[in-house]
Regions:
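Acidic anion/phosphate-binding donor-loop and adjacent secondary structure
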Residues: 49-64, 177-183, 219-236
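A short, glycine/small-residue-rich beta-strand->loop->alpha-helix junction that serves as a flexible
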Residues: 77-89
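Active-site donor-binding segments of glycosyltransferases and PAPS-dependent sulfotransferases
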Residues: 100-156
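Membrane-proximal helix-turn-helix segments that form the acceptor-binding/catalytic region
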Residues: 137-144, 182-200
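Active-site proximal beta-strand in glycosyltransferases
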Residues: 149, 162-179, 200
Length: 236
């Protein structure tokens, strides 16, 4: 339950920004104790603009890729928070792929607290893995690559729209519709599993669910243990 609530807050921060999240939390708190809301959102939220990323707006040049692009993988990710386990898995995969000769790019989409791709890259290298990947902000910075990977439901929409890639994959670590009550966000998250991406799932349960319920082609990445981080302590 706590893990689900924490993830929901992270998703809200991704969509609303830190200030928007604080306003949302304050207004909820104010309603509970019958205080006037500090900032009214009535009339301020442009729903169409808020969900504009859902629209089918193809971008990026199609056609043949050069030799460099054919060994390049784009990773489209939500904003990075220090200590995020989901991001840790993504950056570990990037780090290992680079050791095997692949070029990787990281594209942060949606709201981010970073001012530049360079700032984000420095933070990733300091707090996660020393990746060599170029890091950029915004889906407009996507460049041609053999493979483009979505890593959350809000990143799946720009990956669907990006035309400068030969293959689209979806690294799925959670069944994200379950983070919401049945409503718009639940449906928007669920719809991403029917976009025709090739799914790479954390564990077999997700692979079976996405295949059975959404017709998604999937492969499973088993759960592993980094013995450099997790190891039994000597008995006292």
């Amino acid at each position: 339950m706590l893990r689900r609530k924490f993830h929901s807050l992270k998703m809200l921060q991704t969509k609303l920004g830190l200030r928007g999240l604080l306003v949302y939390l304050w207004n909820r708190f104010a309603r509970r104790i019958h205080l006037p809301a500090a900032v009214s959102t009535q009339g301020r939220t442009d729903i169409f603009k808020f969900y504009d990323f859902l629209n089918d707006k193809p971008f990026g040049a199609t056609g043949a890729l050069d030799a460099y692009a054919m060994r390049t993988i784009n990773w489209v990710i939500p904003d990075v928070g220090i200590g995020s386990g989901g991001h840790l898995n993504i950056f570990r995969l990037i780090f290992l792929l680079e050791q095997r000769g692949y070029h990787c790019r990281v594209i942060i989409t949606g709201h981010t607290h970073f001012n530049s791709g360079e700032e984000a890259r420095d933070s990733i290298r300091k707090h996660f893995f020393p990746i060599n990947a170029e890091v950029s902000i915004g889906e407009s910075s996507l460049k041609a690559a053999a493979i483009t990977v979505a890593t959350s439901w809000i990143t799946a929409y720009p990956v669907r729209n990006f035309q400068g890639t030969h293959h689209r994959c979806y690294f799925v670590q959670d069944y994200e519709p379950y983070f919401y009550a049945h409503g718009s966000d639940y449906c928007f998250a669920e719809a991403t599993y029917r976009m025709g991406f090739h799914g790479i799932t954390a564990g077999g349960w997700l692979a079976e669910k996405l295949s059975a319920e959404h017709g998604m082609q999937t492969v499973t990445m088993g759960f592993s243990l980094d013995h450099g981080l997790y190891r039994p302590l000597p008995r006292r």
